[in-house]
């Protein structure tokens, strides 16, 4: 039987490049190679595409070939340059492990759409909406979902610090893994936080801090028949959750404890799962997403953010939540590819 050819993309130009490589390493180690034939496409930090033997920390130094994904639907694959000539490598389905800008904002999804190649994960629209936290909140609020109070600060805006009630969080509107995020406890800290966030995006979000515990829910599926993982819970000792920025995240977070399943009642976990599914549907997600929320003391659930391409590293939350629900990583990868092929 011919194996299904899966193009696995990783790396990229965003600040989450290294996280993406780690995700691809785990996907490569757990994909069923009897059923699938993986083709590994690494993208350098400067945006150069290369076909390589496998994802690893030093993948660029391995035997690589220049490669591009053709937008020609008839070609349905990759153009790979070998011995000064291009050859066509047919692709049946694409699995992007690209995180952050260009990876989960609709950009690469647009290229997949042009190429006619089915792909794992959310479409252009839902990817773009979920990448921009302000748009996420607008759509969610219209669906009756609670969100933090928020203000959008554009490139030339100079907000008056005294108008806010502190603490607030300042975030790049379109970034991930907590890059550029700062908690601001007083008015005199605001300008610095905004300038820090502007290193990652010209559009900034100021959010009113929300009390309660941080929880998350992994969602899998394309339609009404959605599968959810076990709810997880993040207990912060200080600062913000930023495991992907830490030196040795494989050894555990420096400032947080993640519990799966969350130390909550069955009723609370069930409400969180149902809310996650409601958010997923409202935003038009498909394939997969991790929905992060706050559970307040009064039982109210407030949306934090939606990650349409969550990490697949050994320490990432999405695969851990699914594993706790009985779906190990090899099965999860298989399900995602099958969902992509079904459309």
Swiss-Prot record:
Mg(2+) 1 binds at residue 305. Pfam families: Dala_Dala_lig_C, Dala_Dala_lig_N. Mg(2+) 2 binds at residues 305, 307. It is an enzyme of class 6 (ligase). Its cofactor is Mg(2+); Mn(2+). Residues 137-338 form the ATP-grasp domain. One of its GO terms (molecular function) is metal ion binding. GO terms for biological process: cell wall organization; peptidoglycan biosynthetic process; regulation of cell shape; response to antibiotic. Induction: By vancomycin, mediated by VanS/VanR. It is a peripheral membrane protein. Signal peptide: none annotated. Keywords: Antibiotic resistance, ATP-binding, Cell membrane, Cell shape, Cell wall biogenesis/degradation, Ligase, Magnesium, Manganese, Membrane, Metal-binding, Nucleotide-binding, Peptidoglycan synthesis, Plasmid. Belongs to the D-alanine--D-alanine ligase family. NCBIfam families: D_ala_D_alaTIGR, D_ala_D_lac, D_ala_D_lac_VanA, PRK01966.1-4. Required for high-level resistance to glycopeptide antibiotics. D-Ala--D-Ala ligase of altered specificity which catalyzes ester bond formation between D-Ala and various D-hydroxy acids; produces a peptidoglycan which does not terminate in D-alanine but in D-lactate, thus preventing vancomycin or teicoplanin binding. This is Vancomycin/teicoplanin A-type resistance protein VanA. It comes from Enterococcus faecium. The gene is vanA.
């Amino acid at each position: 039987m011919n194996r299904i050819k899966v193009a696995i993309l990783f790396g990229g130009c965003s600040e989450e490049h290294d996280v993406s490589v780690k995700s691809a390493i785990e996907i490569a180690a757990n994909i069923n190679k009897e059923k699938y034939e993986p083709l590994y496409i690494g993208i350098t930090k400067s945006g150069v595409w290369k076909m390589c033997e496998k994802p690893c920390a030093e993948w660029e130094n391995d035997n690589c070939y220049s490669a591009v994904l053709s937008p020609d639907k008839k070609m349905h694959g990759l153009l790979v340059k070998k011995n000064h000539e291009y050859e066509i490598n047919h692709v049946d389905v694409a699995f992007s492990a690209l995180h952050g800008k260009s990876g989960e904002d609709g950009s690469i999804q647009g290229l997949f759409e042009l190429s006619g190649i089915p792909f794992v994960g959310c479409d252009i629209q839902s990817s773009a909406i979920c990448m921009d936290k302000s748009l996420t909140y607008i759509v969610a609020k219209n669906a009756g979902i609670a969100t933090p109070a928020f203000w959008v600060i554009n490139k030339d805006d100079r907000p008056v610090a005294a108008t806010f009630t502190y603490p607030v969080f300042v975030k790049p509107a379109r970034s991930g893994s907590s890059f550029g995020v700062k908690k601001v406890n007083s008015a005199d800290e605001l300008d610095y936080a905004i300038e820090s966030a502007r290193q990652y995006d010209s559009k900034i979000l100021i959010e009113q801090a929300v009390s309660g515990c941080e929880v998350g829910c992994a969602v899998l599926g394309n339609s009404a028949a959605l599968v959810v993982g076990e709810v997880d819970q993040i207990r912060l000792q200080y600062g913000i959750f930023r495991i992907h920025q830490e030196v040795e995240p494989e050894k555990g977070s420096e400032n947080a404890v993640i519990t799966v399943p969350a130390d909550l009642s069955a009723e609370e976990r069930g409400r969180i799962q149902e809310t996650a599914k409601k958010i997923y549907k409202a935003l038009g997600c498909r394939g997969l997403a991790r929905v992060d929320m706050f559970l307040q003391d009064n039982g109210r659930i407030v949306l934090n953010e939606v990650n349409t391409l969550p990490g697949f590293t050994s320490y990432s939350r999405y695969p851990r939540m699914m594993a706790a629900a009985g779906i190990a990583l090899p099965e999860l990868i298989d399900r995602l590819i099958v969902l992509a092929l079904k459309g």
